[in-house]
Amino acid sequence: MSEKIYDVPAEWAKRAWVDQAKYKEMYARSISDPNGFWAEQAKRIDWMKAPTKIENVSFAPGNVSIKWFEDGVLNVAHNCIDRHLHKRANQTAIIWEGDDPSQSRHITYKELHDEVCRMANILRTRNVKKGDRVTIYLPMIPEAAYAMLACARIGAIHSVVFAGFSPDSLAQRINDCQSKVIITADEGLRGGKKVPLKANVDAALAKADGVDWVVVVKRTGGKIDMNPTRDLWYHEAAAMVTTECPVEHMHAEDPLFILYTSGSTGQPKGVLHTSAGYLVYAAMTHQYVFDYHDGDIYWCTADVGWVTGHSYILYGPLANGATTLMFEGVPNYPDNSRFWNVIDKHKVNTFYTAPTAIRALMQGGDEPVKKTSRASLRLLGSVGEPINPEAWEWYHRVVGEDRCPIVDTWWQTETGGILITPLPGATKLKPGSATQPFFGVVPEIVDADGKVLEGETTGNLCLTRAWPGMMRTVYGDHARFEQTYFSTYKGKYFTGDGCRRDADGYYWITGRVDDVINVSGHRMGTAEVESALVAHEKVSEAAVVGFPHDIKGQGIYAYVTLMAGVQPTEDLRKELVTWVRKEIGPIASPDQIQFAPGLPKTRSGKIMRRILRKIAEDEPGSLGDTSTLADPAVVDDLVKNRQNKKSA
């Protein structure tokens, strides 16, 4: 692990919202007087009725309940748009940068207001009411922001599904939350390639019930099928409605959105976030972590299909009256300079991306970066997975020219916002460390038995205190919420991540400790990939583990046992990769498939994943005790035929 320390640049300590002394003072208050601290933070948003009850939380077994600001009344869209209009009507709210470098648009707060009202009125005329669910399956185009904010405006609950997910995954998510309306596009554009979104929706709706309307945005003009009794063109419907739409009065704990995330079981979990606590926390973390000041141009490269896009493209920045950049494309199209050209074109000050992108661009060498200016950049950020020190150093030295601090942020879909992070004016940096907890966050490291580990140590990361941005439940399944997050270590939120704390009290996230793989910063449940493989007629059994991958952080390694009489071939290997892409989406494509006559199982039939992980990591010498296996000889075959063998 790198132990090089980067001091806070003097000018940052001077201009930042928070320096080291202020961090210590604010953190101490957030722990000693949480009610007073969060009551003060709640003033950063507009309320129709200000809250008098601040925190009402229980992590007790059988009684997990999380409520913040519960008697307050507000509207999230009002806070992201309307309240800025008197001062910022003509300020750019969203800079949209298309997949094609020649396409970009500036959308002012006034234009955003009008477009969101149009979208909200379209939904209202289709009988969408407060509490109804709307599934959004869109590319990174402005209409994705309009759709999310329109739902917030009228009190509908949005469920955004990443536009890379397959029809089956989409159908699963539509059915789980019983959406009434889908908002999609004819096609998406990504890296110059078209993505058949409307066709995917049509295929999904063959397996999903209860959808009354499909609103279709014309993105490419490609030929699609339209069902005249169900489908409507967005541009035609928008021409029929006004640009005024009153906001719904929402209670603080009314749901804002559902976002599905992979769990260690096959069924995706609908993570439910509510209105006030989420918004306060997203806005506050955006201000302090990115040291946002009026006039900054801020770019988070995530997709709105993930929580990072929800919190740090949309809700956090817009609540703060910021200018936020929304990017339709990919880092390497049309070439490896794309990110840096966009930074120069739009004079971006703050840049927040994933280690996967950094590692991929690092492989292309320094030249594509160095031929651009990047003079506007002041701050860099990293999100989605731990960043290895080598990639951190390259990001700092080459992209940031040794002058931009890096905020290496740790958080989850479930947490709503950033939990462990440097603050650029306060925290000395160590490459690869997420450093220290944000205000109100109390990390605790425990061993497998739940014993609290003090000082310099390694173990499982728990959180002992609630914070306003945390999820409230798994949609429709509170028992699963308790079981997943609060049953492993009673009275504590278990993150599922391993963690090391060093002698300076800095936190280093070491990766998942449950059956979840972090691929390119996105969580993929091993059970989900296994289920997809076993659904293939030639597959009898499958086991999936993660392995270290130079670009993605973790790759997907699948062990597949075939049906009797089926021969393993290279063609079948390719067919299975294609099959998984179709079942779940490209993000779940196995990097390695090893055909295995048998899997290592205990006598009770449990697959020993520890052994499979070591083989996938090409560490056959550290398999540990295999004597408890029903058939230890299985391991020899797996070791001999491993796909990741390093060349001698």
Curated annotation (Swiss-Prot):
Binding of ATP occurs at G384, E385, P386, D408, T409, W410, W411, Q412, T413, D497, R512, R523
Gene3D superfamilies, per this entry? 3.30.300.30, N-terminal domain of ligase-like
Chain segments annotated as transmembrane: none
Q: What is its EC number?
A: 6.2.1.1
Chemical reaction(s) catalysed: acetate + ATP + CoA = acetyl-CoA + AMP + diphosphate
Q: Which residues bind CoA?
A: R190, G191, G192, K193, T308, N332, S520, R581
Judging by the UniProt lineage, the source's domain of life is Bacteria
Which Gene Ontology BP terms does the record give?
A: acetyl-CoA biosynthetic process; acetyl-CoA biosynthetic process from acetate
Q: Residues that bind Mg(2+), according to the entry? A: V534, H536, V539
- The family this protein is said to belong to: Belongs to the ATP-dependent AMP-binding enzyme family.
What protein does this entry describe? Acetyl-coenzyme A synthetase
Q: Which organism is it from?
A: Bradyrhizobium diazoefficiens (strain JCM 10833 / BCRC 13528 / IAM 13628 / NBRC 14792 / USDA 110)
At the highest ranks, the source species' classification is: Bacteria, Pseudomonadati, Pseudomonadota, Alphaproteobacteria, Hyphomicrobiales
